[in-house]
């Protein structure tokens, strides 16, 4: 089987590995305009090269007063008039009841959840931790593809029997939590894209392994918009035809065939009959295009 690994609330979870007091709290990681780029103040800048899933980027390390760290974090988003600026780029599951979403303006998020803890993003730290996890996974999974900073694909064929896959990914999930203190969800199926779809179904900290003959029934009611590779263009067309679920789309292959090879490939992925390989990220042809 092929597996998809997706770290749960990665940026927040990463911060909790170094600040354990954040666990079970209402936490967001936020981003504001980077005033450090043109600042004359001393800072530590690091240029990150192309490391697989990431492009070169300039990052700055921040140093905070440990005795008053919550105030120091919030001050990162204050302008000279004391107004808060920034947007939420990640939030803990504890924030869900308050309606806070990725992209919510920080000022609104604080109004929605007055006891909110705000953390400035530290992408250098997130990348370093992601690379440590990748190095560990390369010892556990024979073929590994890093899809993003917090997602991986793996191919277990010839390594783990299909009947043993569920036990393997359960153990792997628990090992990652014990070693890195990072919660992760893992899905497994014959297709990497079905595995990715399944991961979203069992978050957070879940595992699922689904044989091909059970794919159609398990995923029949999932929205077509939730499938990897279904972009706004095809989504609008399917909506015009009143196609809302994967089961409905599987019965109308011609709607995707009209997009040529890309559409045919997408239809096979939706059916779980594609043969897309798990490949090292250095071969960027492994990315799935949206239509």
Language-model features and meaning:
Residues 1-149, 153, 270:
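Residues that scaffold, gate, or flank divalent-cation-dependent active/transport sites
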Residues 4-5, 186, 230:
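Short hydrophobic beta-strand that contains or immediately precedes a catalytic carboxylate
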Residues 96-100, 213-248, 268:
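Amphipathic, charged-and-aliphatic alpha-helical interface segments
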Residues 132, 136-140, 171-180, 237, ...:
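Generic non-transmembrane alpha-helical segments
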Residues 149-155, 190-195:
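Short, conserved phosphate-binding/catalytic loop or strand-edge motifs used
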Residues 154-173, 242:
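Catalytic palm subdomain of template-directed nucleic-acid polymerases
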Residues 164-225:
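Long, highly charged, low-complexity intrinsically disordered interaction regions
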Residues 232-291:
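DNA-contacting surface of Y-family translesion DNA polymerases
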């Amino acid at each position: 089987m092929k597996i998809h690994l997706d770290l749960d609330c990665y940026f927040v979870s990463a911060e909790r590995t170094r600040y354990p007091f954040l666990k079970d709290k209402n936490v967001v990681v936020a981003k504001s305009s980077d005033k450090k780029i043109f600042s004359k103040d001393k800072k530590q800048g690091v240029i990150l090269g192309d490391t697989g899933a990431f492009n070169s980027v300039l990052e700055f390390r921040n140093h905070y007063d440990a005795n008053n760290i919550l105030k120091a974090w919030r001050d990162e988003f204050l302008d000279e008039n004391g107004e808060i600026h920034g947007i939420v780029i990640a939030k803990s599951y504890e924030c869900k009841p308050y309606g806070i979403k990725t992209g919510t303006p920080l000022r609104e998020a604080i109004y929605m959840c007055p006891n909110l803890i705000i953390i400035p993003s530290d992408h250098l730290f997130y990348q370093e931790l992601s690379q440590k996890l990748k190095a560990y996974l390369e010892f556990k999974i024979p073929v590994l593809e890093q899809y993003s900073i917090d997602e991986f694909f793996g191919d277990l064929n010839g390594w783990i029997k299909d009947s043993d896959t569920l036990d393997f990914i359960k153990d792997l999930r628990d090992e990652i939590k014990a070693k890195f203190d990072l919660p992760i969800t893992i899905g497994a199926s014959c297709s990497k894209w079905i595995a990715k779809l399944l991961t979203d179904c069992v978050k957070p900290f879940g595992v699922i392994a689904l044989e091909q003959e059970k794919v159609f029934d398990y995923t029949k009611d999932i929205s077509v918009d939730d499938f990897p590779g279904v972009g706004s263009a095809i989504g609008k067309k399917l909506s015009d035809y009143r196609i809302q679920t994967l089961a409905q789309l599987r019965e109308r292959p011609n709607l995707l065939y009209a997009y040529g090879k890309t559409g045919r490939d997408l239809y096979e992925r939706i059916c779980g009959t594609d043969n897309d390989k798990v490949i090292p990220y250095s071969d960027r042809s492994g990315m799935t295009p949206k239509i």
